[in-house]
Swiss-Prot record:
GO BP field: gluconeogenesis; glycolytic process
Subunit structure of this chain's protein: Monomer.
UniProt-annotated binding residues for ATP: 197, 319, 345-348
Catalytic activity: (2R)-3-phosphoglycerate + ATP = (2R)-3-phospho-glyceroyl phosphate + ADP
Positions with a binding annotation for substrate: 21-23, 36, 59-62, 113, 146
InterPro entries hit by this protein: Phosphoglycerate_kinase, Phosphoglycerate_kinase_CS, Phosphoglycerate_kinase_N, Phosphoglycerate_kinase_sf
Subcellular location: Cytoplasm
GO MF annotations, alphabetized: ADP binding; ATP binding; phosphoglycerate kinase activity
EC number: 2.7.2.3
Listed pathway(s): Carbohydrate degradation; glycolysis; pyruvate from D-glyceraldehyde 3-phosphate: step 2/5
Naturally occurring in which organism (per UniProt): Francisella tularensis subsp. tularensis (strain SCHU S4 / Schu 4)
Name of this protein: Phosphoglycerate kinase
Keywords, in A-Z order: ATP-binding, Cytoplasm, Glycolysis, Kinase, Nucleotide-binding, Transferase
Length: 392
């Protein structure tokens, strides 16, 4: 890799600053999902095993920067980590003036966003954070697209900066899927808006043989094919863009299977009755909330031929059971595939959990925004600074 990884660095008797992604749901002072905490354990354990001292940093939620707010405190997260790793985890509420930690110990610092200058990565704050440790480990891929003090600035000023085990695994999986994929390659891009995924769609066109669109994005493509989408969520101002993408795909020999049938309802409701219709039969007062059985079959058949699958976003309103069939069929097709599969994004992970296919997906990314920016082909600031440090 073009940057140092944790295993390239001497950690014995070093104070190791680790930027983790512990932005987890907390309710009544208890962590309700520990997935992101568990994902950081290999990095933490490796540092301890190598004789280092661990200083953990993370954000939680969106507090007003520079102000303490107990509802965004990481104290419950420190307790949850202690239970998972079966070791004491000290909690440092005020930590910028120094952290008392010895080899073999773990300290969790309070929310980085309580510090003024975090989001703008001010030199003053970045230098203060860097002065706390000997080595900086970036292990929060979910925040790698942000040039903030705890993800980017600290790496500029600390003597050694490297990637943690989780970050290294994320980059390797994504590069395997995007930079050296085993062909044919299929990508699934779902979700409500074309506008947020337009550059992703354009970037993927040059890399894939199959591009499956779902959700509100698919509705915009259905409209681009000249069909009425009734009361469905779609973006009128991006119909021309969708038409261009379809034309470009045709020229490149990329298959975009725009839905041929859909499940519609008269209202956006969990209890709404799902009616299966051809796309040509959707009327003005109906909204498309899922793909239909014919479209499911087409997608499942296409995915059988793929050797690499990249998945970001559902193909319907899978949170409502009446409109979950399309995303369920997609999930099962990916689960049954022999392909190397990478999935990412909050809704995608929720679908994976709902349909119980976690063990059948080759790699599940913990990131949302950073995952998308990687798919767009953008450079991620927190990764770029690690590359720069490796050259120096």
């Amino acid at each position: 890799m073009s940057f140092l990884t944790l295993k390239d660095v001497d950690l014995k008797d070093k104070k190791v600053l680790v930027r983790v992604d512990f932005n987890v749901p907390v309710k009544d002072g208890k962590v309700t999902s520990k997935v992101r905490i568990e994902a950081a354990i290999p990095t933490i354990q490796y540092i301890l095993d190598q004789g280092g001292a661990v200083i953990l940093m993370s954000h939680l939620g969106r507090p007003t920067e520079g102000e303490y707010d107990s509802q965004f405190s990481l104290e419950p997260v420190a307790k949850a980590l202690s239970e998972i790793i079966n070791k004491p985890v000290k909690f440092a509420k005020d930590w910028l003036d120094g952290v008392d930690v010895k080899a073999g110990e773990i300290v969790m610092c309070e929310n980085v966003r309580f510090n003024s200058g975090e989001k703008k990565s001010t030199d003053d704050l970045s230098k203060k954070i860097a002065s706390l440790g000997d080595v900086f480990v970036m292990d929060a891929f979910a925040t790698a697209h942000r040039a903030q003090a705890s993800t980017y600035g600290v790496a500029k000023y600390i003597p050694v900066a490297c990637a943690g085990i989780l970050l290294t695994n994320e980059i390797q999986a994504l590069e395997k899927a995007l930079k050296s994929p085993k062909k044919p390659m299929a990508a699934i891009v779902g979700g409500s808006k074309v506008s947020t995924k337009l550059s992703v769609l354009n970037n993927l066109l040059d890399k894939v043989e199959i591009l499956i669109v779902g959700g509100g994005i698919a509705n915009t493509f259905i409209k681009a094919e000249g069909f009425d989408v009734g009361n469905s969520l779609y973006e009128q101002d991006l119909v021309a863009e969708a038409t261009e993408i379809l034309a470009k795909a045709k020229a490149l020999g990329v298959n975009i299977p725009v839905p041929v049938d859909v499940r519609v309802a008269k209202e956006f409701s969990e209890n709404a009755q799902a009616i299966i219709k051809k796309v040509s039969d959707v009327v003005a007062d109906e909204m498309i909330l899922d793909i239909g059985p014919e479209s499911q079959k087409i997608i499942a058949e296409l995915l059988k031929s793929a050797n690499t699958i990249l998945w970001n976003g559902p193909v319907g309103v899978f949170e409502f059971d009446n409109f979950a069939e399309g995303t369920k069929a997609l999930s099962l097709a990916i689960a049954q595939s022999h392909a190397f599969s990478v999935a990412g994004g909050g809704d995608t992970i929720a679908a994976i959990e709902k349909f119980g296919i976690k063990d059948q997906v080759s790699y599940i990314s913990t990131a949302g925004g950073a995952f998308l920016e990687f798919l767009e082909g953008k450079k991620l600031p927190a990764i770029e600074i690690l590359k720069e440090k490796a050259i120096r």
